[in-house]
Regions:
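Short loop/turn microsegments at loop-to-beta-strand junctions
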Residues: 1-3, 66-68
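Short, conserved beta-strand edge motifs with alternating hydrophobic and charged residues
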Residues: 5-7, 16
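Core beta-strand residues in small-molecule sensory/regulatory alpha/beta domains
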Residues: 7-8, 72-73
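Tandem CBS (Bateman) regulatory domains
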Residues: 13-67, 74-101
């Protein structure tokens, strides 16, 4: 996963930094002091709630073409990320478990 959250002091999600989009800065140490997290972050394509059902998660990933999306609680606090890879792995496991019953 190459996406990292940017939060405030209360853990509210402000944005994300996608390392694949800032490679030019990462490999040039002389630029490190010239940028802040606020300058490098961007709004994620969507935010998911911990209350969102899997159907909403899958639809949101399809609609936004995102492989990684942040998850927040009902106060807007960052909880974690969900990835398409993890989602599909969980789905496959459910299908295996279901077929064994």
């Amino acid at each position: 996963m190459n996406v990292f959250p940017v939060t405030d002091g209360s853990n509210h999600l402000l944005g994300v930094i996608d390392l694949s989009k800032i490679r030019k800065v990462l490999f040039r140490q002389e630029l490190y002091d010239q940028f802040t997290a606020a300058q490098l972050m961007e709004e994620p394509p969507a935010r998911l709630s911990i209350e969102d059902p899997v159907t909403v998660v899958m639809e949101t990933m399809e609609r936004t073409h995102a492989d990684t999306l942040p998850v927040v609680n009902n106060r807007g606090e960052y909880v974690g990320f969900i990835t398409r890879t993890k989602l599909y792995a969980m789905y496959r496991q459910v299908m295996v478990d279901y077929s064994e019953e």
